[in-house]
Amino acid sequence: LIAAAHLGHDGVVKQLIAAGAPLDHVNNLHWTAMIESIVLGNGGARHQEVLRALIAARANTQLTDRMGTTPLALARSRGYDVMVAMLEKAGAK
């Protein structure tokens, strides 16, 4: 799920979610699929759709990276306004 999320493969992400892939798995960088869709994504339509799918599946929007930075703060720092709005609507802090 993490690899598909960072590459913006929204269709694969949706299939993996439907198959029961763990939404909040943390990798060795301490990143989740949600964080990778922001940090390694480009903020474009495919990464937005990945984020939308993760939010809809109820992935945890509060899990932070190793530095304690939330997905919302990561999206803000990159100027990904659509992703910021999606996260805020989902209740991210």
Feature names for model-found ranges:
Residues 3-9, 36-47, 74-80:
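Ankyrin repeat A-helix N-terminal signature
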Residues 23, 44-47, 61, 82:
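Alpha-solenoid repeat scaffolds
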Residues 14-22, 52-60, 86-92:
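Ankyrin repeat domain, specifically the short helix-to-loop turn at the C-terminus of the second helix
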Residues 66, 74-93:
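Terminal, low-structured helical/coil segments at or just beyond the last alpha-helical repeat
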